[in-house]
Regions:
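Conserved class I S-adenosyl-L-methionine
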Residues: 1-41
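Short catalytic micro-motifs in class I SAM-dependent methyltransferases
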Residues: 111-112
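C-terminal lobe and adjacent flexible extensions of AdoMet/dcAdoMet transferase-like proteins
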Residues: 197, 201-244
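Class I SAM-dependent methyltransferase SAM/SAH-binding core
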Residues: 52, 56-97
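A conserved beta-strand element that flanks and buttresses the S-adenosyl-L-methionine
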Residues: 108
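Class I SAM-dependent methyltransferase "Motif I" SAM/SAH-binding loop
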Residues: 47-51
């Protein structure tokens, strides 16, 4: 079984990350997308998790469709929507086969790109291009190889689990392993791309790289997350993609 078929459910069971409230980060991110687009509009979020960004975007005026393959995640999205007095369309399905409708002015995929191999990434990006309306924009979090190579071996202890960062140098993949106190460890493995590498992936997908927004970085020694750092220090960046 592919690691992604169980990782996110086990991560949520261990940390509750998909059942959390909306964080100011989600509100800020929704505001940034709205400002970049110039106005709210139809928006698709892939890998919506518990719907925190989905609801933040809806509160910013977007008409949001949330697509998440993990069963049950849509329930929390709908719960958040009710709590905040808004409505969204929450769908459960595979990104590679589901039909979320559209077209969309914006497609967002946060913290999950790189699950498969290059051909699978190309296939997904081709689908994203097909979902975009003319003049639409895709916003995709992409993990950087340099951060994960530099911080491989970092370990964080909590009462319930140990978390360890790793890096597969041959496959250029970040590794994020959770080891519960009394259960088998499980690992997330995502393909990392520099902006130059991403540009090599895009031909034939119908998308082109328009901008790069450097992301943040977690400082393991200080135990502090810095939300904005230079690209050469960031854990990930947002690839702003437009139809070619």
């Amino acid at each position: 079984m592919h690691w992604s078929h169980s990782f996110y459910e086990r991560q949520d069971a261990l940390t509750g990350c998909y059942h959390a409230p909306i964080h100011p980060f989600h509100t800020s991110l929704a505001a940034r997308v709205t400002a970049h687009r110039g106005q709210p509009g139809p928006l698709l979020e892939l890998g919506a998790g518990g719907g925190q960004f989905t609801i933040a975007a809806a509160l910013a005026g977007h008409r949001v469709t949330a697509l998440e393959w993990m069963a049950g995640a849509g329930e929390h999205t709908r719960l958040l929507a009710a709590q905040h007095g808004t409505t969204v369309q929450a769908l459960t399905g595979d990104f590679y086969t589901a039909d979320p409708g559209g077209p969309f002015d914006a497609v967002c995929y946060w913290d999950g790109f790189g699950i498969g191999e290059d051909d699978e990434q190309r296939h997904l990006l081709s689908r994203v291009a097909g979902w975009l309306a003319p003049g639409g924009t895709a916003y995709v979090d992409v993990y950087t190889p340099w951060y994960w190579a530099h911080h491989a071996g970092f370990t964080r202890q909590t009462e319930r689990y140990t978390q360890t960062y790793g890096f597969d140098a041959e496959g250029c993949r970040m590794l994020d392993t959770y080891a519960p106190r009394e259960a088998e460890a499980f690992t997330q493995s995502l393909r990392c791309y520099s902006p130059a590498d991403l540009c090599l992936l895009l031909p034939g997908t119908g998308l082109t790289l328009a901008e790069v927004w450097p992301g943040g970085a977690y400082d393991p020694k200080a135990g502090v997350y810095h939300p904005e750092v230079p690209l050469g220090e960031s854990m990930m960046y947002v690839a702003v993609l437009e139809r070619a």
